[in-house]
Amino acid sequence: MEHKLTFLDGAMGTMLQRHGLKLGEIPELLAITNPDLLTNIHRQYIEAGTEIVYANTFGANRRKMQKTPYTVADVVSAAIAAAKKACIGTSARVALDIGPLGELLEPMGTLPFETAVDMFAEIVDAGVNAGADLICIETMTDLYEAKAALLAAKEHSTLPVWVTMSFDATGRTFTGCTIPSMARTLEGLGADAIGLNCSQGPKQLLPLFQELCRVTTLPVIAKPNAGLPDPVDGHYDLPPEDFARTMVDVVGAGVSIVGGCCGTNPDYIRALHDAVHGMTPGARDIHHGSFLCTPTMPLEISGVRVIGERINPTGKKRFQQALLAGDLDYIVDVAIAQVDAGAQILDVNVGYPGVDEVAMLPRVVRKLQETVDVPLQLDSTNAAALEAALRVYNGKAAVNSVNGEEKALQTLLPVVKKYGAAVVGLALDEKGLPKTAAERVAIARRIVDAAERFGIPREDVFIDCLTLTVSAQQDQAEETLAAVRTVHRDMGLQTVLGVSNISFGLPNRLLMTQTFLVRAMNEGLTLPIINPNQKEIMDAVAAFRVLSGEDEACAAYVERFGSEAALAAEKQRAAAVSSAPTAKAAAAVTNLDDAIIRGLKADAARLAKEALATENELSLVEKHLIPALDKVGTDYERGVAFLPQLLGAAQAAQAVFSVIRDSLAAKGGEPVKKGRIVIATVKGDIHDIGKNIVRTVLENYGYDVLDLGRDVPPETVVDAVVKENIRLVGLSALMTTTLPSMEETVRQLHTLPNPPSIMVGGAVVTPEYAQNMGAFYAKDARASVEIAKKVLG
């Protein structure tokens, strides 16, 4: 497919509006109430050159259908039938179109991951039964939700599955996901094609299409909007000919599947077809090396990448106690200390007698991903535990490890393949520990061959050449180094070693470990598993990166050691964590502001209680809580923190407010409140993700928020404002079809004798549109706080 073009359709919503879609009407129900209209629209697109039409099933999910007399299956089957009717006599095919569920998944929201998978599976089952030719998952902004939809599609069908996500002007999705993280995660999970749709026009998205074509081997899809909407009339500003002209550059970048999204119609698809028909997609310079990620943190394995070893109960009594007690906050503290010290990947091992690893490993993974954004390496040989953890992991993880025994390969590699993980191959087999480098290399080759047979690319196989204790097997150190050299230089693979094993049983272990580490890195060790809290070890890594050319212009080295102040700060930090945390007192977070910023609910509550011994409740709010939230908000605006961090800080702030409320109640005092705000998603719009985020953040700045919900009539908003004497109202709209409802709500509020200030936001709202209505423009939750401060103080 990369060598020929495939033409998709344009917007369904745009066409339905043209044909009189009423405000508040559910578009998906037209499959039952007016199927001929849908067939006519599909046929217009086919006549314009479309080869694959998207059935009118974008929002046909359980959540949206629950207030209608129809089931998901009723709507999906009718929509696909209408599309298939349009294809009669042509070669066009029908895609089951699956959009977002309209609710944030845990931990950012309240929707459990498996519930989301089940909701998507219901749509997939209906689409398969109705005869869909392929599945197109689109307009996703949360990589976790895209994963849930893709898993449902792969587990409930054998149809091809395409996935597109929506990226904004920052080059990230609404939740902070990057292009490489999206590409490698979805590719690993088995998507057949990936791309971008909606959010912006082709000119704005062109750099992102170019980036995507460089980082994935899959066919790339482009379905951009017809430019940007006019703030007054909602019409998109890019004519069909200009749209098509820019799409020539998109195809030139290597995109092979093209269509349009919001604002496009058959005229756009016809112009697109005329402009690029007969073109061959541009040659793609694909860089596809070893890679791990979380949504916000892509990590290419090029050069040395440090794996932190401390999340492991072996020999750590306090850690063992935490596991047995289910004290995940302690484990998070251990993780934070390692990341702060420079770990780029965290090894996660929870295997201990009395611990249910199948239940505990996914719990720890979820907890860690709430707080740290580095990729995880799941350390277990328990296939059930690994599957449970990989299923809930958001991004591309590594599995540590599989050995060369055939049974282990047959058991673990299918799990690795299904979830698109990388895997550490341990160079031993049923015969035991190999004595020579040649034997280890031979096992490594068998592991790679087996992985490739299961469809795991060789760049996703990392080889552990085994570090044995030098005090007991002195000759084995050289064999290990020789194996590392061959595996990395001759086989071209990433290499792993548990470095600290070398010094077990010796005095001055640090010196021996550090020396062996440097020798191993020089031979080709790229993924050392070490204790990053040991300053001398990390200093050795920093120096090696300079000498190997990885640290260009010595920039990181100079930053680490370039000033006396930096050296003093580093020594102070190292003294605090040089031995792994053994008690809560050694936790990484020791002040309230830091706990809020990091989103640590339990630590924030504990530190708030301690602070109340010397400060009053108002002081906690003004000196700690608000400055901490402001810091996260500023980082969010600068693009160095993202939605997960913003919501994590808000949740930690909620924990602090609970402590403050309890303290005031015990004294008989009044709650800390800064003013009341009404918020609502306007009539006809059932999307409330953005509104809910705004509510959470406002509440944690001390504002009392009355949330009227979604699909709220103007009269309901006005009644609440009058009854509660509200001075600030927040309105949200996600769809252009509901902008008239927003305008009407604002108009009615302005007619009140003492009208409130109004702030508006949502994906389709612009600053000009807000100004024309006489409202503040709140581009995000952070902006809503600044408006509230201006209006209410």
PLM region spans:
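Domain-level signal for soluble alpha/beta catalytic cores
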Residues: 1-793
